[in-house]
Amino acid sequence: MKNQFSRRKFLAATGAAVVAPLVIPRSVLGQNGSPGANETIKVALIGLGNRCMDIYPREIKPVAGLKIVGVSDFWTVRMKSFFDKSPNDLQPEQAYADFREMIDTEKPDGIFAMTATHQRAWVTGIAMQMGCHVYIEKPMCLTIEEGR
């Protein structure tokens, strides 16, 4: 059987291997202030209602390599309830009424937006403009216009 590996294929494969390090984004390697693949990812929770109380202890808190750096809810009664009911490592000084202040102070890599549907587009839009990755559940917004 004839060898199907030609000089052309060899040069193409070698060229790709040489060029790959030049085109891989620095963020993948953990440079420019973003976390690398093996570093802890800092996240924040926005909206501390029933959905958060359901998801946080089961799905978010147990994830290895994930650190909750702050929580935000404009309703202080809900924040108090979060700290009373949820076993967590957070301190009350990491709780913010204004999520923008929390993002500015704590500098999370991403947020979990568990707000009411009518608030999601606004909250996630601002968080993304501030440089955060966003986890959001459906529906993302109420109308097509709101999502644009």
Regions found by a protein language model. Give the residues of each.
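Active-site loop/turn elements of alpha/beta-hydrolase fold enzymes
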Residues: L48, P139-M140
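Rossmann-fold NAD(P)-binding glycine/threonine-rich loop
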Residues: M140-R148
